[in-house]
């Protein structure tokens, strides 16, 4: 109980701005960089962006509008984007930077949450193993 209270106190305020708010702001900024990298590579429309990311249009729209859930991009979404053959190199770099930052705790999360995220990111997907989801 004391540990939770201490953590809440540490993250409640710093220089008048919530630490959590700062972390979420950094996370949203990195996701906006991903969107800009797609535009810079010529993927301007939502259809083009969703194809480049290998995601559904609705998922792409939610992510790129930085209105994604508070915990950020899931390991499954990150892996799907990285597996997309149409993903431009700069967008790939932004996703890898986002992943490294998330693992380092830049966007928050306990050590346990970050460890679980790491395990999910590094676990091979059926596509990486040469299987299709249809064959499973």
Stretch-by-stretch model annotation:
Residues 3-42:
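A short, Lys/Arg-rich alpha-helix, primarily the initiator
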Residues 53, 64, 82, 95-99, ...:
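A general structural motif at alpha-helix termini
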Residues 89-136:
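Short, charged recognition helix plus adjacent turn
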């Amino acid at each position: 109980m004391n540990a939770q209270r201490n953590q809440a106190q540490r993250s409640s305020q710093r220089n008048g701005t919530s630490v959590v708010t700062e972390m979420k702001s950094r996370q949203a900024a990195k996701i906006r960089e991903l969107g800009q990298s797609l535009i810079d590579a010529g993927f301007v429309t939502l259809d083009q962006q969703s194809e480049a990311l290998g995601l559904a249009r609705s998922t792409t729209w939610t992510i790129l509008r930085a209105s994604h859930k508070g915990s950020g991009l899931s390991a499954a979404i990150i892996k799907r984007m990285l597996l997309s053959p149409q993903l431009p190199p700069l967008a790939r770099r932004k996703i890898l930077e986002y992943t490294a930052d998330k693992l380092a705790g830049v966007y928050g999360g306990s050590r346990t949450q970050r460890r679980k995220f790491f395990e999910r990111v590094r676990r091979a997907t059926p596509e990486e193993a040469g299987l299709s989801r249809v064959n499973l």
